[in-house]
Amino acid sequence: MVKLAAKCILAGDPTVGKTALAQLFRSDGAHFQKNYTLTTGVDLVVKTVPVPDTGDSVELFIFDSAGKELFSEMLDKLWESPNVLCLVYDVTNEQSFTNCSKWLEKARSQIPGTTLPGVLVGNKTDLAGRRVVDVAQAQAWALGQGLECFETSVKEMENYEAPFHYLAKQFHHLYREKLEVFQALV
């Protein structure tokens, strides 16, 4: 049984639900943050995720970073060497989706020339009447960027675990590939 540790960057614009998503995931659905508070730096959420059919697990160190541009300079150091990326946007806010390109570019610049497994998460699907970002549009963009696409409603506690389980599985897969290469060299 192997226990791996992965640094996960949680990125996206303010008010898209990054903190609520991380907190709900950490608490296994027991805690939904009803009052909004602006993240002004980085909150760290740690949770161990079992990798199916392996007996192994990945401890995700989720860096929940401020979505405000003015805070982004101080985050550069904290964003160094990420292992996985979770981009979050609000399905009712077109600009938050558009800005995912900026967040992705920033994250990838931290590890040039290296694969960064990632997911694109459309949050607030409970606000279906106000939706402006189409599922197909998000899926097409994610596919073009090499990301897996998910939708969730943190408020309704729907599908909030799936992105993190996917990231843990992808990180474990990369570990197994590197291990096989190393063993072939020995």
UniProtKB/Swiss-Prot annotation:
Keywords: Cell projection, Cilium, Cytoplasm, Differentiation, Flagellum, GTP-binding, Nucleotide-binding, Protein transport, Spermatogenesis, Transport
NCBIfam families attached to this UniProt entry: small_GTP
Organism field: Bos taurus
PROSITE patterns attached to this UniProt entry: RAB
Domain of life of the native organism: Eukaryota
Descriptive protein name: Intraflagellar transport protein 27 homolog
Subunit structure: Component of the IFT complex B, at least composed of IFT20, IFT22, IFT25, IFT27, IFT46, IFT52, TRAF3IP1/IFT54, IFT57, IFT74, IFT80, IFT81, and IFT88. Interacts with IFT25. Interacts with IFT70B. Interacts with RABL2/RABL2A; binding is equal in the presence of GTP or GDP. Interacts with IFT88. Interacts with ARL6; recognizes and binds with the GTP-free form of ARL6.
Residues involved in GTP binding: 12-19, 64-68, 123-126
Any Pfam family matching the protein: Ras
Localization of this protein: Cell projection, Cilium; Cytoplasm; Cell projection, Cilium, Flagellum
SUPFAM superfamilies: P-loop containing nucleoside triphosphate hydrolases (SSF52540)
GO biological process: cell differentiation; intracellular protein transport; intraciliary transport; kidney development; smoothened signaling pathway; spermatogenesis; vesicle-mediated transport
Primary localization: other
SMART domains (UniProt xref): RAB, RAS, RHO
Function (record text): Small GTPase-like component of the intraflagellar transport (IFT) complex B that promotes the exit of the BBSome complex from cilia via its interaction with ARL6. Not involved in entry of the BBSome complex into cilium. Prevents aggregation of GTP-free ARL6. Required for hedgehog signaling. Forms a subcomplex within the IFT complex B with IFT25. Its role in intraflagellar transport is mainly seen in tissues rich in ciliated cells such as kidney and testis. Essential for male fertility, spermiogenesis and sperm flagella formation. Plays a role in the early development of the kidney.
Cellular component GO terms, alphabetical: cilium; cytoplasm; Golgi apparatus; Golgi membrane; intraciliary transport particle B; sperm flagellum
An example molecular function term from Gene Ontology annotations: GTP binding
Family per similarity comment: Belongs to the small GTPase superfamily. Rab family.
